[in-house]
Structures are given as C-alpha cells and as structure tokens.
Amino acid sequence: MRGADPNAPWLLYLHGNSATVASRGNVVRYQGLRSLGLNLAAPEYRGFGGVAGQPSENSVTEDARHGYRYLRETLGIPASKIIIFGWSLGSAVAVNLAADVPSAAIVLEGAPASLVAIGEMRYPWIPIRMIMRNPFESALKIGRIDAPMLFLHSPEDKIIPIEEGRKLFEAARDPKQFVEVRGGHIDPADVDASVYFGTVRSFLAEHGLLTRSADGAALKRRDGRW
C-alpha cells in the first residue's frame, strides 16, 4: 500500500498467529502506521488467510523474506528505507528476517524471547524443548541485528508476558528503546493509540525515517480516537 509520498520509507508488516493480514487488529495498526506517512507491505504466510501450505518457523520466515525481496528487487527500495515491524509471533519472524538482512529500523510488539521458554513456563511437566518443532529462539538471534530497535509491550499481556519482552530487549544491541503500552496483547494500538503510534512516530523521526510533515502531523482516526 503506497502512501501519498512515494519516497517515504516502507514498513514490512509481519502479523501474529491466529490472524490474517485482514484481521481487525492488523487493520487498526495499518491505519495508524500509514497515518505517519509510511508505505506499507504486509505479506501473508502460507497456511494463513486461505494461502495454501503448512506453516512452520522456516516457512513463515521464508514468506517474510519473500516480502522483503519484493521491496528490494521488484520495487527497488533500498534497505535504508525498509522498516521491519512484527507483532506477537510476527515479532519472532521479524527477528529471524532482520538477523539476516539489512534494514533501517525494527519495531517489535509483544515479542517473545523464546517460544520454548513460554511453553515450559505454561506446561512444566511436558518436555517442551524436546518436542517443539518451531522454537523461535529470538534471544539467540537478536544480537545479530545492528539496526535501531523499538520494543512495545503491555504489562497486562497474558499471552506473551512482559518479562519475555524485557529479556529480548536485554539481548538486543544498542540503539534500542523499550516502551510500555496499555491494552494487553491484542489491543494496545486501539486503547493506547496516542502512546503507541506517538512512540513509533518519535522513534522513526529520531532515526531520520520520517519526513518533517509526518513527524509533526497529529494522529487522528476517523472515529476521532487518535
């Protein structure tokens, strides 16, 4: 989705589990992110949203890589204008991708340090590490990313506890920023929109990724809540 400024940075949006690119939570985020003046691309994973195939850690990462290659090779977008954004499971996919390709900045929302660790916490009587086929060990990979990173996480998150996000933050290289938002795992972009999108706007502006007009623009949604 191109914005009004064709020269604006592109945001590669990677959604979470139990969702599709058309899910309401994703659409709310698209609207707010595009209001910053960004162009946006949101590839769908195989096995999601009617796309054929069986999802796995390797397959969703490859689908994200295909979206990145589309921006670089088909549209000719330089890595210096690509922001990788991941929410929930998509944040783990974003780490996998960003560990291997250059980018301008990374934004992670509700990010787990390790899906194995979350499984072990919830089911301590099961040998999760032995049987889990898609561990998404983000904390072991994030140190390879040298782009600026923003972490958004809610203390009310019952799906990916905020402690997981902090562990991942600690494993990341500088420059990095961790910001708490309200709304649990699903709704920060809705119930805490001004903090959520205002933080993203400030972070991108700090790293030279927003035009002056976008940096100074007031966020406002059609229902008036931004």
Locate the predicted segments by residue.
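Post-His helix in hydrolase/transferase enzymes
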Residues: 189-203
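Primarily recognizes the serine-hydrolase "nucleophile elbow" in alpha/beta-hydrolase
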Residues: 70-74, 80-125
